[in-house]
Regions:
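Residue-level detector of flexible, active-site-proximal loop/helix-junction positions
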Residues: 88, 103, 137
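Catalytic nucleophile loop of clan PA
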Residues: 109-134, 142
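Short beta-strand segments that buttress and anchor functional surface loops
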Residues: 83-85, 105-109
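Hydrophobic residues embedded in beta-strands of well-ordered beta-sheets
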Residues: 47, 103-106, 128
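Serine endopeptidase catalytic core focused on the charge-relay Asp
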Residues: 1-100
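A short, polar/proline- and glycine-enriched secondary-structure boundary/capping micro-motif
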Residues: 10-15, 115-120, 141-148
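C-terminal cap/linker of serine protease catalytic domains
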Residues: 27-40, 48-65, 131, 135-178
């Protein structure tokens, strides 16, 4: 899953990524579903990439090192979430300030290019639970800053509703082939 606005509108397109020198600009797959309704309230922004590239390393982990144990349940305002963005090149964490039926807003900074990255919650056992896909950020004091200013908060599209809608299963550290 990724942010829908990361796809070219109206067409399935190939997804390529520079995987840190391991597979420079390897084809990962193809967008098979894209919903990019806008950037307001409950408008959805989600894309499904079908992994069909050759030699795509698949790891049920964040940044290839922190195992994903499942999908987070019972999110609450005040809990800490983290996100990883390719634009930032690092993770950032902050408290949840708002939860809706399809989104979660939390106080983690970011920048353009972070969209589509994972949003997760650290668990007591050292694993993380998947929460959402980063779709946008903002600054309540700078309206329409675009990429000119670093975001002060992040918004994620929750993954659970889309896993259910598209009948997908989360690959976790426990379920991954060994």
């Amino acid at each position: 899953l990724t942010a829908g606005h990361c796809n070219r509108s109206g067409e399935p397109s190939k997804v390529t990524m520079n995987l840190g020198g391991v597979l420079p600009y390897a084809t990962l797959g193809t967008f098979s579903q894209t919903i990019s309704e806008g950037v307001h309230d409950e408008q959805h922004d989600i894309g499904l990439i079908t992994l069909d590239g050759d030699n795509v390393p698949q790891s049920p982990a964040i940044a290839a090192s922190v195992p994903v144990s499942g999908v987070a349940a019972n999110l609450q305002v005040g809990q800490q979430l983290c996100k990883f963005g390719m634009g930032s090149g690092a993770d950032a964490c902050g408290q949840i300030v708002e939860i809706t039926g399809s989104k979660v807003k939390f106080l983690a900074g970011g920048q353009c290019g972070d969209s589509g990255g994972p949003v997760y919650r650290y668990e007591n056992d050292g694993t993380v639970s998947a929460v959402g896909i980063l779709i946008r950020g903002g600054d309540p004091y700078t309206r329409k800053a675009g990429c000119a200013a670093r975001a002060k908060f992040s918004v994620a599209e929750l993954v659970r509703p889309w896993l259910d809608t598209w009948r997908l299963t989360m690959v976790t550290a426990a379920s991954a082939p060994r």
